[in-house]
A protein has these predicted regions:
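N-terminal secretory targeting modules
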Residues: 1-82, 279-294
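Structural beta-sheet core signal
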Residues: 85, 151, 186-188
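A short helix->loop->beta-strand "cap" motif at the edges of active sites that frequently abuts
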Residues: 181-183
Length: 294
């Protein structure tokens, strides 16, 4: 669950970021000599405002589990591909308007089309989950023996101030457990929380730095564990930042249906490779210009 006051008040790194910002380009609140302590107080107020704007989720993510067939086919022969999705509210697609617009459903449908086989989707993601919650999710899906597992995790580790090295190590252990079970793993690393518009400076800069630090640590751990990392912040950060009205849902924190399609398209090339399917699928949704992503 979102924990912005904790991020604002208790992270010593925020004090350093705020201090550096004050000494650099004009300072905070237009005062170049603003003190870091004042910046932290400002960040606490911004966290309060952001939490009021974002609110608490009152609806569940769309349920999209099921069997997906290639487009235009009512039945197919052969063994179905099994796809599992693990992680937090992003993986669960909280904010998507319908089941067909979730990350899991988009990936399952595209995987079915590309492979010509049926795809069985199971989503075990939990809203508010941190990396430490992956173990329980893995237990839920191991008996299903998925061919590919997709993990999207990290935002709640940042807002709850879990050390990047700790969160990344736990993620690496989770990937290793899945790989030892013969499951291919694709991981969408922590998105750039600095693109969340309700966060003002200096809180936005601190959130961006912390989330990108975690993403870098995740990428290293996932690679070492035999997984396939996808740097969501690098691919989609600028897209979400420049067009928040398109890619964020009404709460301005979770992605919209368009946002989740963008995330799914970023993940799709590695998902296809993990399933043994060669593809030149672009990492951005159709209609998005290549210069919109960092």
């Amino acid at each position: 669950m979102l924990n912005l006051p904790s991020l604002a008040l208790h992270d010593e790194r925020l004090r350093r970021v705020a201090s550096a910002a004050a000494k650099g380009g004009g300072g905070l609140l237009g005062v170049g000599t603003a003190l870091a302590g004042t910046a932290v107080g400002l960040a606490a107020f911004q966290a309060y405002q952001a939490r009021r704007t974002i609110g608490t989720p009152t609806i569940a993510p769309p349920y999209a589990d099921g069997r997906y067939l290639p487009e235009g086919k009512s039945a197919v022969r052969g063994v179905s591909l099994r796809l599992a999705v693990l992680g937090d509210s992003g993986a669960a697609s909280l904010g998507a308007e319908g089941a067909g617009e979730t990350i899991g459903a988009t990936l399952a449908a595209d995987l079915a089309d590309a492979s010509g086989r049926a795809v069985i989707l199971t989503n075990a993601a939990v809203v508010g989950a941190q990396s430490s919650d992956l173990a329980e999710q893995i237990e839920r899906i191991l008996t299903l023996r998925p061919h590919v597992a997709v993990i999207v995790i990290g935002g709640n580790d940042v807002t709850h101030l879990v050390r990047p090295s700790t969160a990344a190590r736990i993620l690496g252990d989770s990937v290793r457990q899945l790989r030892e079970a013969g499951i291919e793993v694709v991981v969408g690393t922590c998105p750039d929380l600095g693109s969340v518009r309700p966060l003002g400076a200096p809180l936005r800069q601190a959130a961006s730095k912390l989330s990108r630090d975690l993403a870098a640590a995740q990428r290293a751990e996932v690679t070492a564990a035999g997984g396939r990392p996808v740097p969501l912040a690098d691919i989609l950060g600028e897209l979400f930042y420049s067009e928040p009205e398109v890619y964020f849902s009404a709460d301005q924190f979770h992605p919209s249906s368009a946002g989740y399609r963008a995330v799914a398209f970023a993940l799709l090339p590695e998902v296809l490779r993990a399933a043994g399917i060669s593809s030149d699928v672009p990492a951005l949704p159709s209609g998005s210009s290549s210069d919109s992503a960092a």
